[in-house]
A protein has these predicted regions:
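Short, Lys/Arg-enriched N-terminal segments with co-localized hydrophobic residues
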Residues: 7-24
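Entry/capping segment at the start of metal-dependent catalytic domains
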Residues: 27-99, 276-278
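Extracytoplasmic
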Residues: 64-67, 83-88, 97-105, 116, ...
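C-terminal solvent-exposed extensions
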Residues: 78, 106-109, 113, 117, ...
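Flexible, polar/acidic helix-loop-strand segments at domain edges
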Residues: 81, 161-253
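Soluble non-cytosolic domains of exported or imported proteins
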Residues: 81-84, 115, 124-132, 150-154, ...
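Amphipathic, coiled-coil-like alpha-helical scaffolding segments used for oligomerization/assembly
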Residues: 127-192, 245, 265-267, 271
Length: 349
């Protein structure tokens, strides 16, 4: 690939229009780096260009220690009056242990929402957006988070459509559940490129369209919200995998597609440093470590209707140590010693 073409791509994707007085980076450049963090896996070709530019410009100091970013997937459907946080994941850039982690927080976790009372975790976003959600997470789990990246599901459908679909392995039950909701999702999806409505033909590895993938992310009736969280992580990983296989010439259009549906409070230089750090960690060969909370093992949590909160997950308050040790000490959640100490279980509420 000749240098002139490379420089043109970098200029178009990363610099855009630069303010003469402030010299700050364009929204498009910020969206590129945000996309990288959202997808976690940091596509090699894109990062190759970005890494080259980072090493030729001056950025802030190296990010040290552990950085937690709250990744929010908001689902404000057309027939609903307000947005709710349908997907909550903590993206951890761990420079202490050289690892990247993706931890799902179940939206139905029973928590004490400051100023509101007991309810579901995702209700804190409904009542006070990201700031109240930050407070709730800090009070309940002892994890202080100040940075967030928010993506709405409608926009995520556009990204998957632009990618030509994503490959996801699904079970027969999942396929049947998705096909039940596909017609309504398709009908409400306002995109001229969505094509004719199609159902998923079978189980196994299937290439899902945008509306099929989001229907897949939403299903929960066949199992529980915990499995739903796992499905959401699978789709994110599938998007990342597909993104890596796309030609560099398509990045510009993909970024334009994603841009309207992304919101973040992270500054551009900070995003650059995070992206560079994440890339360096993943270059060492470690894969993304995944976790989820509450711990669903019929011992450290209990699911069901509770008081006036509806269907919730009550969790063992002492099991928060498993979550914190995974994020801060890099201790595998499934092999944490606390899980054997059943005499200390104390359900909240």
């Amino acid at each position: 690939m000749n240098k002139k073409y490379v420089d043109t791509i970098i200029l178009r994707l990363y610099y855009g229009k630069i303010c003469k007085r402030g010299g700050f980076m364009s929204r498009r450049k910020k969206i590129v780096i945000t996309l990288i963090l959202i997808l976690v896996l940091l596509p090699a070709a894109l990062m190759g260009f970005l890494y080259y530019k980072i090493n030729t410009i001056k950025t802030d100091n190296q990010v040290e220690g552990i950085t937690n970013i709250l990744l929010l997937g908001t689902d404000g459907r057309k027939n609903e009056s307000a947005y709710r946080s349908d997907c909550m994941m903590i993206v951890t850039i761990d420079n202490t242990h050289n690892s990247i982690k993706l931890t799902s927080l179940a939206r139905d976790t029973y928590v004490d929402i400051p100023g509101v009372g007991m309810g579901k975790l995702n209700a804190s976003y409904f009542w006070g957006k990201d700031q109240l959600l930050f407070k709730t997470i800090k009070n309940e789990f002892g994890i202080e988070i100040e940075k967030f990246i928010q993506v709405d599901f409608e926009g995520l459908m556009d990204v998957i459509t632009a990618l030509g679909g994503v490959d996801v392995e699904i079970s027969k039950k999942e396929m049947e559940a998705v096909n039940k909701s596909v017609p309504s999702t398709y009908e409400s999806y306002d995109n001229p490129d969505k094509g004719e409505m199609k159902l998923i033909p079978g189980d196994g590895v299937q290439t899902l369209t945008g509306y099929q993938a989001i229907s897949y992310c939403r299903i929960r009736d066949i199992d529980s919200a915990i499995y739903r969280d796992a499905r959401q992580r699978k789709v994110i990983m599938a998007i990342a995998s597909k993104f890596k296989s796309m030609p560099v010439s398509s990045y510009d259009d993909l970024i334009k597609t994603l841009s309207p549906c992304v919101t973040t409070n992270i500054g551009t230089i900070e995003l650059l440093n995070m992206a560079k750090n994440s890339y360096e960690i993943l270059q060492k060969g470690d894969s993304i470590k995944q976790g989820e909370f509450p711990i669903i093992d019929e011992v450290h949590s209990k699911g069901g209707k509770y008081k006036k909160a509806g269907w919730v997950w009550r969790y063992d308050t002492n099991s928060v140590v498993v979550l914190k040790q995974f994020i801060f000490d890099d201790v595998d959640m499934k092999n944490n010693k606390y899980l054997n100490e059943t005499d200390k279980i104390k359900l909240n509420g």
